[in-house]
From Swiss-Prot:
Pfam family, one: SPC22
Subcellular location: Endoplasmic reticulum membrane
InterPro entries cross-referenced by the UniProt entry: SPC3
Quaternary data: Component of the signal peptidase complex (SPC) composed of a catalytic subunit SEC11 and three accessory subunits SPCS1, SPCS2 and SPCS3. The complex induces a local thinning of the ER membrane which is used to measure the length of the signal peptide (SP) h-region of protein substrates. This ensures the selectivity of the complex towards h-regions shorter than 18-20 amino acids.
UniProt function note: Essential component of the signal peptidase complex (SPC) which catalyzes the cleavage of N-terminal signal sequences from nascent proteins as they are translocated into the lumen of the endoplasmic reticulum. Essential for the SPC catalytic activity, possibly by stabilizing and positioning the active center of the complex close to the lumenal surface.
Ranges facing Lumenal side: 30-147
Family: Belongs to the SPCS3 family.
Protein name (record): Signal peptidase complex subunit 3
GO cellular component assignments: signal peptidase complex
Cytoplasmic topological intervals: 1-6
Predominant place of localization: endoplasmic reticulum
Amino acid sequence: MHSWVQRLLTTATTAALLLLAACCAASALDAFHVPSVQAQAHVTKINRFHKQLNGNDKVFVFLTAEYENSKNSLNQVSLWDHIIPDKDKANLQVEVKSKYPLIDQGSSLRGKKVQLVLHWHVMPKAGVMIRDRMALSEFNLPDSYTS
């Protein structure tokens, strides 16, 4: 006859294995789930962002300015970011100034072509994190700055 402690341990182990199997199944099924995202931006304005959430995840959205220089083929400066906690708050319509300023510390940005890129990371509670990006618009910075 088994003691109550052995029965409790058997029950806890079985429950843990079932939870592990459910997490593995959720992770495997995430490979077939590709979220649809729609976005449009102009230099500093995001008109529309829509993400269909399934209640299992949060979405981290950020806007970067990307440019090239002689030292690096890709430079990224984050201009704005936002966390979408649930599907009720997934439709963004914002008109904001840059949350993080684009500062030219060594005059290497003068006359450069800068492209705005919207990135998003879908972070589920269990499963694979999905990353994607969308190029939005590009512009040239001035050759000289005013003081």
